[in-house]
Amino acid sequence: MTNILDRIKAYKLEEVAAAKARVSFADLEAQARAQAPCRGFAEALRKKSAQGYGLIAEIKKASPSKGLIRPDFDPPALARAYEDGGAACLSVLTDTPSFQGAPDYLIAARNACALPALRKDFLYDPYQVAEARAWGADCILIIMASVEDALAVELEAAATGWGMDVLIEVHDGAELDRALKWLKSPLLGVNNRNLKTFEVTLDVTRQLAPVILAEGRELVCESGIFTPADMAAMAAVGARRFLIGESLMRQADVAAATRALLAC
């Protein structure tokens, strides 16, 4: 049976082909070069995590596993709420078919605050990296479960060329080994959610954290964090940086919820 990553890859490749037909790579590069310099995603996380926790706060309307998460969806207001609550960075979904995201959400959210922003999407072509920069993104995501080694290297090089940071995402030891071997970016995210089954367990971070920290990389714990107790449990294994979306997106007062989560 086709898993979700296979389905997403199929429609993403179609999206990229259509985008290239609309906007040439040369025109897209011109748009990217016209953007203000990147805000420094990894550095913002470092500064916040040195004082407590570094939070990548996610702006996400829906997901394949949970459906609609936030009916009252206002990206600029959410970005300001996250900033007021003490987040270090934003993560904004730009995938439409599976997450009801959009490039306009990334643009609007980043313009509404001073935080660096990650384009949260499934990338398979350097064209998408240039898109991210043209939309103002300061960081991209490379999901090791969805790309081969050579493509991961190509995407990282493209991001570095634009002055962007890279968040590398892994879910198991094999993906981590590949990331450590082929990629140089310091931010290494552990997704506690299996993207093929959607099962979530914090044991994934517990298992991989020692290796990541021993290699001198900067651990980011992703998915499955809902309470201060969850954060404390992950901090006990060395996590000081977190990517959190759903639990905050479901709160009426996002700024207060963010503040409370970071106060633990």
UniProtKB/Swiss-Prot annotation:
Q: Which GO terms describe its biological process?
A: L-tryptophan biosynthetic process
Hey, which family's this protein in? Belongs to the TrpC family.
Q: Does the keyword Amino-acid biosynthesis apply?
A: yes
* Superkingdom classification of source: Bacteria
- Could you cite one Gene Ontology molecular function of this protein? phosphoribosylanthranilate isomerase activity
Q: Which reaction does it catalyse?
A: 1-(2-carboxyphenylamino)-1-deoxy-D-ribulose 5-phosphate + H(+) = (1S,2R)-1-C-(indol-3-yl)glycerol 3-phosphate + CO2 + H2O
Going by the record, the broad EC class of this enzyme is lyase
CDD domains according to UniProt: IGPS
Name of protein = Indole-3-glycerol phosphate synthase
Residues annotated as signal peptide: none
Which pathway, metabolic or otherwise, does it act in? Amino-acid biosynthesis; L-tryptophan biosynthesis; L-tryptophan from chorismate: step 4/5
Q: Which UniProt keywords apply?
A: Amino-acid biosynthesis, Aromatic amino acid biosynthesis, Decarboxylase, Lyase, Tryptophan biosynthesis
Gene symbol here is trpC
In short, the EC number is 4.1.1.48
